[in-house]
Design a protein with these regions (language model features):
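N-terminal cap/lid segment of alpha/beta-hydrolase-fold proteins
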Residues: 26-73
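Primarily recognizes the serine-hydrolase "nucleophile elbow" in alpha/beta-hydrolase
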Residues: 135-200
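C-terminal catalytic histidine-bearing segment of alpha/beta-hydrolase fold enzymes
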Residues: 250-301
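Mobile cap/lid helix-loop segments that gate and shape the active-site cleft of serine hydrolases
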Residues: 43, 191-224
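Short beta-strand/loop motif that positions the catalytic acidic residue
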Residues: 228, 235-237, 241
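Short beta-strand element of the alpha/beta-hydrolase
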Residues: 76-86
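Conserved alpha/beta-hydrolase "acid-adjacent" motif
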Residues: 242-251
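Catalytic nucleophile-loop/oxyanion-hole region of alpha/beta-hydrolase
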Residues: 91-100, 111-150, 278-286
């Protein structure tokens, strides 16, 4: 028992030392802070009505959680489709109830997407799941008498990557009989938007089958960016991001501007790490303020 306690103390001291000395801007720095960030989200959660779980395929990962707005919340023009991050391989919608709670308190219907994962799958299966999930949202809105609602497509990190592909590669939604014209706004947080500026991390290599050229293009949103984007678009990224390089959003914004896109807001979180861009549901956080103000503007358009 004494040996076990010594091992635990050693691990704790090592963790603390790394926490204090590792500089920002790398995945170790981010990983050391992830448990505390997740705990903070968990502590924010209040009792909510049970979300409706909607399957869109036979695999146990192919489902949505549908969160409905609280009864006393104001009605909104938009519904939100949200795809969470975690490197195309971790996480599940149930971990982001605090985000759903923030949206439902504002009056939004919110659909949180789960999809199959790497390494068992690659971007081809994830694209399929993204299309099927969005089609299921559209069908559910019709069933609920909510087809008049506008759709805000929203994603963080790897989830933002899938959202951007759904928006900019028309073939993705064509496979389920839809087009990107169903979207009225797009919000992307710390998103891998130009995979050419990404370091060859294991998740990226698994996603693209070791950067196979054909598969790589299927995963790279900027590859499909060919014309002006008409809908309101928000990019948020921390300039000290240690997971998805800040340059992703910088290069993507430059390309959008060069194509004539005007309804675009790019917010840089000064000193912000990867987790900061995912903190849009935390009151008082700069990301929450930026996202909240942008939502208010698009609601009033």
């Amino acid at each position: 028992m004494l040996l076990f306690m010594k091992i635990l103390v050693g691990i704790a001291m090592g963790y603390l030392a790394l926490y204090l000395v590792v500089p920002p801007g790398n995945f170790v720095y981010e990983g050391l802070r992830l448990p505390f960030w997740l705990l903070k989200l968990r502590k924010m959660v209040k009792p909510l009505p049970e979300p409706r779980k909607i399957k869109y395929g036979s695999h146990f990962r192919q489902y949505l959680l549908y969160f409905q707005p609280l009864d006393n919340s104001p009605s909104k023009q938009h519904v939100v489709i949200y795809i969470h991050g975690s490197g195309w391989q971790h996480g599940r919608p149930e971990m982001f109830v605090a985000n759903a709670q923030w949206l439902t308190e504002q009056g939004y219907h919110a659909f949180f997407v789960s999809h199959r994962r790497i390494p068992q799958c690659d971007i081809r299966e994830l694209r399929t799941d993204t299309g099927l999930a969005i089609k299921t949202v559209v069908d559910t809105l019709s069933e609920q008498g909510l087809s008049h609602k506008k759709i805000l497509l929203c994603g963080n990190s790897a989830g933002g990557n899938l959202c951007a592909l759904a928006m900019f590669d028309r073939r993705l939604l064509a496979g389920v009989g839809l087009s990107p014209d169903i979207f009225s706004a797009l919000a992307l947080f710390a998103t891998p938007l130009d995979l050419r500026v990404m370091w060859p991390s294991p998740p990226l290599l698994m996603l693209t089958r070791m950067k196979n050229p054909e598969v790589f293009d299927l995963a790279n949103p900027i590859h499909y960016l060919e014309s002006e984007v008409q809908i309101p678009t928000l990019l948020i990224h921390g300039d000290q991001d240690g997971i998805a390089e800040y340059q992703n959003s910088v290069v993507f914004e430059e390309k959008l501007r060069s194509l004539g896109t005007k309804n675009l807001h790019f917010a840089t979180l000064k000193g912000g790490m990867h987790l900061d861009s995912a903190s849009w549901c935390i009151p008082g956080h700069p990301c929450c303020e930026i996202f909240g103000n942008w939502l208010e503007r698009i609601e009033n358009q």
